[in-house]
Amino acid sequence: MKSVKKSFQYGNHTVTLETGGVARQADGAVLVNMSDTVVLVTAVGRKEADPGKGFFPLTVNYQERTYAAGKIPGGFFKREGRPSEKETLTCRLIDRPIRPLFPEGFYNEVQVVATVLSMNPEVDADIPALIGASAALSISGIPFDGPIGAARVGYKDGEYLLNPTFEETAASDLDLVVAGTENAVLMVESEANQLPEEAMLGAVLYGHEQMQVAIQAINELTAEAGKPRWDWHPPQGDAALETAIKDLVGDDLAAAYQIPEKQERQNRIGELRQRAVEALGENREEEGGWPEKDVGDAFKGLEKDIVRGRILAGERRIDGRDTRTVRPIDIEVGSLPRTHGSAIFTRGETQAVVVTTLGTGRDAQIIDAIEGERKEQFMLHYNFPPYCVGETGFMGTPKRREIGHGKLAKRGIEAVMPAADDCPYVIRVVSEITESNGSSSMATVCGTSLSLMDAGVPVKAPVAGIAMGLIKEDEQFAVLSDILGDEDHLGDMDFKVAGTESGVTALQMDIKIQGITREIMEQALEQAREGRLHILGEMNNAISGPRSEMSEYAPRLLTIRIDPDKIRDVIGKGGATIRALTEETGTTIDISDDGKVTIASADKAAADEARRRIELLTADVEVGTVYEGKVSKLMDFGAFVNILPGRDGLVHISQISNERVERVGDYLKEGDTVRVKVLEVDRQGRIRLSMKAVQDGE
């Protein structure tokens, strides 16, 4: 098969899609080159589904090879290990927009693998990987209702930027990734610097408009190199089974979905599901019956119809709320006595226990990313143990979902974090989800904001988050504020917004259907703003701003700046000076190459003493200034006096007294404390001192 290429201009980048030359045994394989960042994306699907499988087994793997950046991996084995956080997040980024485009009832296993082969350190590989996944699936013949396009959007000085570089993104007020088909937006992932809702919506629509060139190129590639679409037909619904289930449990199921308490409701629904299986399944006493999987699918369909129908008819939601009401909120701040900052945030049946820990510069996380090494001063970790939903399960390393939710919460908070000069601490926040019924990532945002303020971190403003949902049938739709887990599962959109009173700091959107209009997104953003302001009001009642005093158990950090040329004076020969300083004062001292000195200690007095000593070590000797010093050595011609740490000057025999001095030892001995005045510092740094000048001055 000959190689087929399609190229297009995408912002300031040229993108080339190529197929037919590499990985030819995969169902679909595309090399994407975006300004020298090259990603190979393959798609393979099994021709037969596993019998009895009731879900779509899609796997997405994204892997960055260090050779792409001309590096050799660290560690003993010198090869890539488990996925990094960036790789895990990119897997989710690819999965979310492509998953809804596989047809209902398609349960064949599909695997998409994206491998970064070459890396331009200024061009992120996530957009080429997304475009490549869309292209590989489109040419593979696997049933897929794509293609999709993807774009990164920045925002600076009132202008949108298309596919900005890493450097441009760092200077931008927005980092937004949007993916969608020709007619619809399917996924948004973003962080922003408190931007208004109109700017966020404008960025989504701008990105969708600009990605059409990528969709067109994929369509052209598919027309020229695509394989025939699989001869797959969706399973037909069984009208008789649907009617039988509705007659059997319809009224009881509708009543069950009006039980506000989650576990009681789930227990009742479980009983009804079991009743349906026993009455209509193949194992019933009478002849006939349907397979258990079919009965389960029909039961799920009835659940969906009941919940969605009630909401679209203007009736109350599952827990009795209307579409705009936020669940009751309960907040406890500072409840964990030995932590540096803590908050328990409860919204309905979702609860997060969030704890802040303050550390020093040496606690920063070193990220050895493919585009370069950096230090992370702010970490946010999200834990979702099985007990929070009343289940048992394996507990170990964080799963993809936990990493993704933690990153979303971090994006929501990052815009209000103080600059390093205002808060020199390394900060780690951990969110323990102790109860969950929808929107736990947004509970983490609220809890993190409260916990940081309890720890005394000078955040620029409090941040709250809310999850929105959507039910849409034809032209009728309802936007739901603060959705429950069931509403998320049975709805058409999951739309999470975090922000301050001034604007949005993070937006994540996952849309399961086509046809979400600008009007729907506008209403969702406006309703989210209304809910966010309500939550901020509740948070303000608990703690209105950062505490002025930190926990007594938090380290005290003092930051001073010294002349970089004097760093060696503080460190001393072989590190002797700084080692003695830390041991004698009980502090931890970090010195950066630019002369920034950070002193950490649980005892403020010890930190102050360390600062005083460092200031003395780095002080300049000023001519005309009187110092108190110790006689360090006697000579025939005078005495050396230590006036500053590491700085000795000479008091000549003629400068000891107004009287004639025959022997230095008659007036001074080693260890004496004397007051001296600096007469001169010569070009070689030698210091001339006088005791006589001090006497004359007095």
UniProtKB/Swiss-Prot annotation:
<dbReference type="InterPro" id="IPR015847">
    <property type="entry name" value="ExoRNase_PH_dom2"/>
</dbReference>
<dbReference type="GO" id="GO:0005829">
    <property type="term" value="C:cytosol"/>
</dbReference>
<dbReference type="InterPro" id="IPR027408">
    <property type="entry name" value="PNPase/RNase_PH_dom_sf"/>
</dbReference>
<dbReference type="GO" id="GO:0000175">
    <property type="term" value="F:3'-5'-RNA exonuclease activity"/>
</dbReference>
<dbReference type="GO" id="GO:0000287">
    <property type="term" value="F:magnesium ion binding"/>
</dbReference>
<dbReference type="GO" id="GO:0004654">
    <property type="term" value="F:polyribonucleotide nucleotidyltransferase activity"/>
</dbReference>
<dbReference type="GO" id="GO:0003723">
    <property type="term" value="F:RNA binding"/>
</dbReference>
<comment type="function">
    <text>Involved in mRNA degradation. Catalyzes the phosphorolysis of single-stranded polyribonucleotides processively in the 3'- to 5'-direction.</text>
</comment>
<dbReference type="InterPro" id="IPR015848">
    <property type="entry name" value="PNPase_PH_RNA-bd_bac/org-type"/>
</dbReference>
<comment type="subunit">
    <text>Component of the RNA degradosome, which is a multiprotein complex involved in RNA processing and mRNA degradation.</text>
</comment>
<dbReference type="Pfam" id="PF01138">
    <property type="entry name" value="RNase_PH"/>
</dbReference>
<dbReference type="GO" id="GO:0006396">
    <property type="term" value="P:RNA processing"/>
</dbReference>
<dbReference type="Pfam" id="PF00013">
    <property type="entry name" value="KH_1"/>
</dbReference>
<keyword id="KW-0694">RNA-binding</keyword>
<dbReference type="InterPro" id="IPR012340">
    <property type="entry name" value="NA-bd_OB-fold"/>
</dbReference>
<dbReference type="InterPro" id="IPR001247">
    <property type="entry name" value="ExoRNase_PH_dom1"/>
</dbReference>
<keyword id="KW-0460">Magnesium</keyword>
<dbReference type="InterPro" id="IPR036345">
    <property type="entry name" value="ExoRNase_PH_dom2_sf"/>
</dbReference>
<dbReference type="InterPro" id="IPR020568">
    <property type="entry name" value="Ribosomal_Su5_D2-typ_SF"/>
</dbReference>
<dbReference type="Pfam" id="PF03726">
    <property type="entry name" value="PNPase"/>
</dbReference>
<dbReference type="InterPro" id="IPR036456">
    <property type="entry name" value="PNPase_PH_RNA-bd_sf"/>
</dbReference>
<dbReference type="InterPro" id="IPR036612">
    <property type="entry name" value="KH_dom_type_1_sf"/>
</dbReference>
<keyword id="KW-0808">Transferase</keyword>
<dbReference type="Pfam" id="PF03725">
    <property type="entry name" value="RNase_PH_C"/>
</dbReference>
<feature type="domain" description="S1 motif">
    <location>
        <begin position="624"/>
        <end position="692"/>
    </location>
</feature>
<feature type="domain" description="KH">
    <location>
        <begin position="555"/>
        <end position="614"/>
    </location>
</feature>
<dbReference type="InterPro" id="IPR003029">
    <property type="entry name" value="S1_domain"/>
</dbReference>
<keyword id="KW-0963">Cytoplasm</keyword>
<keyword id="KW-0479">Metal-binding</keyword>
<protein>
    <recommendedName>
        <fullName>Polyribonucleotide nucleotidyltransferase</fullName>
        <ecNumber>2.7.7.8</ecNumber>
    </recommendedName>
</protein>
<keyword id="KW-0548">Nucleotidyltransferase</keyword>
<dbReference type="InterPro" id="IPR004088">
    <property type="entry name" value="KH_dom_type_1"/>
</dbReference>
<dbReference type="InterPro" id="IPR012162">
    <property type="entry name" value="PNPase"/>
</dbReference>
<dbReference type="InterPro" id="IPR004087">
    <property type="entry name" value="KH_dom"/>
</dbReference>
<comment type="similarity">
    <text>Belongs to the polyribonucleotide nucleotidyltransferase family.</text>
</comment>
<feature type="binding site">
    <location>
        <position position="488"/>
    </location>
    <ligand>
        <name>Mg(2+)</name>
    </ligand>
</feature>
<feature type="binding site">
    <location>
        <position position="494"/>
    </location>
    <ligand>
        <name>Mg(2+)</name>
    </ligand>
</feature>
<dbReference type="GO" id="GO:0006402">
    <property type="term" value="P:mRNA catabolic process"/>
</dbReference>
<dbReference type="Pfam" id="PF00575">
    <property type="entry name" value="S1"/>
</dbReference>
